[in-house]
Amino acid sequence: MTFWFIRGLRRGVVTTRYPARPDRAARYLPTPPAFRPEALTRQAADELAAICPSGALHRDGSVLVYDVGACTACGRCAAEAPGAVTASGQFELATTDRSVLIKKIPIRGEAP
Ligand code: SF4
């Protein structure tokens, strides 16, 4: 115990230097989705909303409403529609304004 304490004082925190330096493990983190409006159709948006376990997605007319604050980055939507949804790679999403986390994605894809 004493050894670990002294080593910790000498080296400081060694598990990560984030945010002072980029975290090497960040590329392995699951991140919220990014949507391609031109690849989204109304039907696809409805299907994505139906499979989202956290209720982070719903369609409002020709807009897919995405609540980043409710998203758990589970990846189901990206697996369902890989052409329209990809991982964003973003995880620094903290904000004091809840409304910033509500994204309105226009649906521009044509129905097949
Ligand atoms: S990653 Fe999961 S929780 Fe987030 S929007 Fe997609 S299905 Fe919903």
Label every PLM stretch briefly.
Residues 1-61, 68-70, 74-112:
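Non-ligating segments of multi-cofactor redox enzymes
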